[in-house]
Amino acid sequence: VSTSKGIMTDNDARVKNVGGEIICRVFWFIMSKLGKKPIQIPKDTKVKVEGGKLILTGPKGSKELSINDKIFTASISDDNSLILKLIKKNETSKVMWGTTRSVINNAVIGVTVGFEKILEINGVGYRASLKGNVLSLQLGFSHNTLYEIPQEIKLTVEKSTIIKINGIDKTLVGKVATEIKMLKPVEPYKGKGIKERGQYVLRKEGKKK
């Protein structure tokens, strides 16, 4: 094991409660490097900085983010980039720097072009339809399975077997896609169920009689 005290056996490192410092330092370096990287704001999108608050407005909608103004400062540069700077530098704030920068960047992408997940339904008689803000699914059960669509999500159904999930919040789009997939996960033998487009499904051969 590589440690700040040299190379040790795994057992010695456990006894002396050391190890992993090199990996941690590399991680802090990567997150710091990410945090320093400016976020380019597209011409159709506006970002307003108000203390510890960021207000983002773009073609797809608006979003408000809060940042810890005791740790970070945010500003807009002359070339229309958002710069996130650290006030206090320590191991924890360096990790938060990269994470916060990623959250802001995703918000910029979200209000500018949005995020999308596409689900595919496979199975004889399996289909989907929309009834207001409710997704109705026929998935081989004796009753329809209903899923209430969050207000922030735009959901469309194409050809009864394609579900498109759109929104400005990357996390919420992913959450909705996962919840719908879990209503009928793809089984490995015939591939029946709901899967994300491009998702690899490990197929199994059925038992031979």
Where do the PLM segments sit?
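Ribosome-associated RNA-binding proteins
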Residues: V1-K209
